[in-house]
Amino acid sequence: MLQALNLPKKVYFKPGCMPVALRELGDIYRCQRALLVTDPELYRAGIAAPVADRLRKQEIRVAEFFTIGKRVSFGDLRSALPKLSEFQPDVIVGVGGNNAMSAAKALLALYGDPDLDLAAAAADPARIPACAKAKLVLIATNFSSGSQNSPFAILKGEEGQAIVLKSIHLLPEISVTDADFTAGLTAEQVRTCGLKSLSHAVRAYLDPDCTELTAGMLTEAIAAVLKYTERAMNGSPSAREKLHNAAALAGASYGNVVDAITPDLPYFPTGEEITVSDNDVRCAELAERLGFAGCRDFFSACQSV
């Protein structure tokens, strides 16, 4: 049974908070070299650019690593080892959804131990080292997995199968839940993220290891998704902030409730494809049975796109 809440060292969660959060890297941590981990689509769309610009304004050198495909593979991660060795970053910054943030977590682990067997580490989390060479910063650009606050990294194994790492050493020094990054999400993306976030929260809420502390966060997350998804789909910035915070709460909670996640469970963060499954819909129906208000309106909003 859980006896302590394991969370990022510092959690920023207001619109526009990214520059304030990153200021710490120069002012407090005296970082000089940052490895920016992101998805090519986000980079081309300019979504990651404000992060790189902010780092450079603090005279922090920036190198980039781009994830490939919908889930980062062992091979992709291994290909980054020469860059890690040559560039010697003192901070790794993951910007994106679950895929980019999982890649940043795995690279931190490999930076700490380049010989780490990722498949073996998935079976034995004690193998995952604490990395003394770099801090980890995670910046979420959607509200599906809440990975910026969770100890999970979801990777693609040698045979294409999903491999899940979990360790408190994969929690970031700083997590950033800045709703300004969600402004470009379409109504359909908002719907899909809302269903996925609700699925995570409901499954963790029903888990036998859910405690009073995690239940409080999950109750808030479930209620927010049900109440604000329709408004967020219609473009409301304040509603998108609510959903972004709800996903952050869900991620922080299921990371403290669930010992392991597998691809067949609905709270499994599926990466950038973020497809809606029947399990996600069933979890939304479970929320109604649990007595949460607003389920009918939520279903109607989801069916409208």
What name fits each language-model region?
Residues R56, E86, L107, D124-A126, ...:
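N-terminal loops that bind phosphate or other acidic moieties
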Residues M18-A21, R44-I47, F74, N99-A104, ...:
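Short glycine/serine/threonine-rich phosphate/pyrophosphate-binding segments
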Residues A204-D278, R282-E285, A293, S300:
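Active-site segments that bind and position negatively charged phosphate/pyrophosphate groups
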Residues K9, G112-E212:
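A glycine/threonine-rich phosphate-anchoring loop and its flanking beta-alpha core
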Residues T38-D39, V95-G97, M233:
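Glycine-rich beta-strand-to-loop/alpha-helix junction loops that act as flexible
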Residues M1-V91:
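ATP/NTP phosphate-donor binding region
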Residues P50-V51, A80-L81, A100-P114, N149-F152:
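Short Gly/Thr/Asp-enriched flexible loops that form oxyanion-binding sites at enzyme active sites
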